[in-house]
Structure formats: C-alpha cells, structure tokens
Amino acid sequence: MRVCAKWVLLSRWLVLTYVLMVCCKLMSASSQHLRGHAGHHLIKPGTCEVVAVHRCCNKNRIEERSQTVKCSCFPGQVAGTTRAQPSCVEAAIVIEKWWCHMNPCLEGEDCKVLPDSSGWSCSSGNKVKTTKVTR
C-alpha cells in the first residue's frame, strides 16, 4: 500500500509538471506572436523608430552623432527625416537628393543642401547642425 501511494503521488507531480510546461510553452508562443518573430519588433506601417544611437567627439571637439533607424515605409517611400525625427518620405526626394524637400529641420531653422549634395545643414542664428547621409 505504501509503494502504491508513493507512485500515485509521483504520478500526480509528473502530471502537474507536464501541465505547467505546456502552459508555459503556450504563453511563450502567444506572447511571441504578439511581438512578432523572435528577435524582431513590428513597426507600425508608415513609421520609423531609432534602434541605436551613437555619440562621440572628434579631435576638434565637435560632437558627432549617428543613429540607426528601422522603418516600415509604404510603397514609394524610403527612410528619411522630418522635423529632425526619422520618418518615411517620398523616394524621389532621396533619389534626387532634394534633402530640404523632406523638411528635415526644426521649426525656425533654415535648411541648405550641402555643396556636394551628400546631406543638408540646419541653421538657426550661429548654430549649425550638419547631416550627411550614409547607406
């Protein structure tokens, strides 16, 4: 009788453990479905988000910033900048390098395309922010 009671207790623990494992797997799978695939993050269509930011100063004590952006743009759009924030812009703006047409500067700043068309500068008073486009 004693051996039988131990087996019943052990089998109950095994069943309980199995049920908990199945529940955990189901919860993990459902939360992964809400987030997207493992390691991926879904972005609302037509928007961008910053995924990494880098800051440093060069030897002339000029602060240099760069950022990595992930976008989910509609057809005919590509990653760009509007009001100093990452955004989806018309592809023609980037293809033709009409940088100031995407309104990259903040309100009150003047936009000028760099002489070599590699980017733009936003200026206000004696403050100038230069952006060079890299791919």
UniProtKB/Swiss-Prot annotation:
Disruption phenotype: Mutant mice exhibit enhanced mechanical and chemical hypersensitivity following inflammation and nerve injury. It is found in: Secreted. InterPro entries: Chemokine-like_TAFA (IPR020350), TAFA_chemokine-like (IPR051743). GO terms for cellular component: extracellular space; glutamatergic synapse; synaptic vesicle membrane. GO terms for molecular function: receptor ligand activity. Residues 1-31 form the signal peptide. Expressed in a descrete subset of dorsal root ganglia neurons called C-low-threshold mechanoreceptors (at protein level). Expressed in LPS-stimulated monocytes and macrophages, especially in polarized M1. Keywords: Secreted, Signal. It comes from the Eukaryota. GO terms for biological process: macrophage chemotaxis; phagocytosis; regulation of membrane potential; regulation of sensory perception of pain; regulation of signaling receptor activity; superoxide anion generation. Induction: Up-regulated in LPS-stimulated monocytes and macrophages, especially in polarized M1. Modulates injury-induced and chemical pain hypersensitivity. Ligand of FPR1, can chemoattract macrophages, promote phagocytosis and increase ROS release. Belongs to the TAFA family. PANTHER family: CHEMOKINE-LIKE PROTEIN TAFA FAMILY MEMBER (PTHR31770), CHEMOKINE-LIKE PROTEIN TAFA-4 (PTHR31770:SF7). This is Chemokine-like protein TAFA-4. It comes from Mus musculus (Mouse).
